[in-house]
């Protein structure tokens, strides 16, 4: 929808919620109405910094500047003033790790992104000496390069002056939600240093039962507690803070919702009951299953995480399968191979062939996440023959997205004992009809996309709105959810089984490729 849509009409009403979505490749601000309908947005990309193989960084200053710009632009384009916004929510790429000076606001180092694998030796050592079991038991996570704890340890050990600053109380840690919130509420002039339970649950540092930083876990990574933010509800009864009047919003708006991006998508998809699941297709894929107030420990390579917490209610938990490379594999076809000029062309190219021609592509660029958790894996194209073309590679790339999701669904069913009946989907790739049809075929269940596909921003808008009474209760959110498109399986059982067997065989070829000992 156009940035300027509705123009002056919007300013006649105060019935709007703003949502900041600070993602891996871009930052956007979106405005929603009472019906959960998007009425405006503005979005800006930021640089992907790749200093060496396996390292991925972002510039924290650029992230904040992009956040300020999208806020200013969407408010200006719609003629909205701060008094027209009932509340503001923040959702973000999780695990990405920032450290900055509380007095100057200057970062000590670039943000280390969730995809970054420089901490593989830290993670491997934790598992080798048995300490990984403590992390699994308390934090619900396996020791992996994915999570914030190892990234923060790396900064403390490798960036001059950071450990001393942390021990003196001068250095602050946060994921992007904390960084954006701190700057919006004043930065060095009294900015609020806080995160929510969902983001904290992705650090390997928070106890899932107490919802607090755990001293035993902190000691594993030698992290001073003083540098950590306060942990709060995803939609607290009192605002985290208010936007600084002299900041990009131009007035005081309460900030009342914070959710990690995948948790926000769960809320946006209204997966609020145990057994409901969604799959978000972005840079990576993230499939979550609501397990209610029960902490379900995975025996099949999944993560146990906080799904959300509203107000002072008990937290709701989830099982999650995190997949590192899905949408970014399509970007690889565009940026590194040059066989497409835009992501949308992947569908047209893949439609030139009826199948993958016996070729499988496993995009383990930075190892494999759920359910394998193998940082020693690297990408591979297998089954290649002279018969294969660019079209087969495009098809195999779309299939890789879907087969990785099948890996997670199978693990989820084994852990929960719940057979998936339908999969709600969201994210950019859901606009690719062929990919979604393949997903239905690979899983053998219907795949359903909602009218509002940007469920991440919508979810945190819901959280922020619930906190201020913009929506009275979660039941109001269900009335807003509407189906846009449904894909029904066309493969028979034999075709489905044969295709998946080939995928599993291909995955085995990617293992033990790099030494992480």
Swiss-Prot record:
One of its GO terms (cellular component) is cytosol. One of its GO terms (molecular function) is ATP binding. It comes from the Bacteria. Sn-glycerol 3-phosphate binds at residues 24, 94-95, 146, 261. Keywords: ATP-binding, Glycerol metabolism, Kinase, Nucleotide-binding, Transferase. Glycerol binds at residues 94-95, 146, 261-262. SUPFAM superfamilies: Actin-like ATPase domain. ADP binds at residues 24, 28, 283, 327, 428, 432. Its EC number is 2.7.1.30. Pathway: Polyol metabolism; glycerol degradation via glycerol kinase pathway; sn-glycerol 3-phosphate from glycerol: step 1/1. GO terms for biological process: glycerol catabolic process; glycerol metabolic process; glycerol-3-phosphate metabolic process. ATP binds at residues 24-26, 283, 327, 331, 428. Inhibited by fructose 1,6-bisphosphate (FBP). It catalyses: glycerol + ATP = sn-glycerol 3-phosphate + ADP + H(+). Key enzyme in the regulation of glycerol uptake and metabolism. Catalyzes the phosphorylation of glycerol to yield sn-glycerol 3-phosphate. Belongs to the FGGY kinase family. This is Glycerol kinase. It comes from Mycobacterium tuberculosis (strain ATCC 25177 / H37Ra). The gene is glpK.
